[in-house]
Amino acid sequence: MCGIEKKRKARRDGAVGEALAAEYLRKKGYEVLEANYHHVHREIDLIVQKDDCVAFVEVKTRSSDAILEAPLAVGRRKQMFLFSAASRFLAQKRVGDCEVRFDIVWVETEGADMHVVSHIEGAFTPFGG
């Protein structure tokens, strides 16, 4: 598979993984507020709410033989982009007083099959957690 085909497949897998993650979160009682929220060159895969908590979710779709663990797949630079976009979303939508959290949903591919492996609530914080 050439580089362009790999990128297309990765994009396709990412979109399917995000849809799967959204469905998984809905089943856990979350309301999906936004999918693929864009601000400047920043994107948040999913923004969900449950009770008084808004979670900004990064979805990572990887093959089952991937070595990288989910929390390590979101580097500090990406986290900073997420924090910036989240701040913009909160200001734009005038979200009231609520808990804000940054989560990761890890989706694994095995051949043609995909499934959610884990949902890590509070995977990282603006303060380096």
Regions found by a protein language model. Name each.
Residues 36, 60, 103-105:
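Solvent-exposed beta-strand sheet faces enriched in polar/charged residues
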Residues 25, 44-67, 82:
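Conserved catalytic cores of phosphodiester-cleaving nucleases, focusing on short active-site segments
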